């Protein structure tokens, strides 16, 4: 688990405190779609290229336990993905990003990346969290039957893994 200092350092490496936040977008493809937690002034349907959405991160916290790990979605290399682009409110963007960093980066299972969000309103530059294949939480491809069993049976403090599937 990352410390507050590590999280802040990581966020500042991607988005320094003095960043102009007037056109700052975040790409949501999993729980951010239905529970964005960040104050935003606009949301648009967006497609990214070069990554696809996949259950590829083990969780022993939110949607699983040490005894029965669950799986959560991440972006993995290849393909494309439709999700939601959130334009952050400029006056609160840095504080909102710190909150988002605590939620998404605490286990260091993701890498933060700038991606092109293709929307009906043009191309936006957006921040996305993609799977870090070097972390132990990364789940390489598995038989479909095993994936279904995991999602159907795992439960964590945020509820059953299958609820996460249906919510996203």
Indicate residue ranges for each PLM-predicted region.
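A glycine-rich, hydrophobic/aromatic-adjacent loop/helix-cap motif
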Residues: 1-168
